[in-house]
């Protein structure tokens, strides 16, 4: 069983991020993940001035100070960067990390940061269309042994090489963010390598909910003639380990979190994670860790992750 953590790139400092990454690299953690936002979500006007580091830059720096952790984003917003550029950045950081990079990408949802920085924010349908096309383009570059030509409705490649190619073989894995049943999981079945059920999105995060989403993915894989076992099933679960009922309530209310969150005493959090593992989750990423200190991540390592040794 593998465990990761989503480490915040906003409301904190680089020294805090690097300290946490260093401790994680020495512990039980298998992976480190970063959100991709240019303003701190969920978009409160009074918080827009707070720190929000650019996520790919942070990850590149973390690659240089760690030696073991796999790393990626949960998830990059497709509308922020040209997908050809994303593929190039991905292959570069895969070499910096000696093959530890995972490309996590989604259609993007945060309208306010598009407005703030002058990026177009298309309709949901167009964002899904663009996202599917971007996944096709990126995968095409990842798997090709020669320059790639691609002509879509939104993106074009003209005899474009990907050099350096992926450091890891057979190629950098693609994590498709989101579990929308009609479009996103279908895109994952065709172009992705990793599914991630996102507790931030408001689902109940029960074993039954997880298995339902896997069932939908399996049907899409059948439609494309793909073996669903080729796709790794993962979960992002916001969590807080605390015996203090007031702290738990404040955590849930302050972040507007619901059923997708495991907040409570240690054994409750362990049981919630264990149920997802029994349902077939192959990796659990813990998100929403409110205290960005090495000691807190070490505490979760020793008190929660150790239960699954």
Regions found by a protein language model. Name each.
Residues 1-309:
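Active-site-adjacent structural elements that line small-molecule/cofactor binding pockets in enzymes
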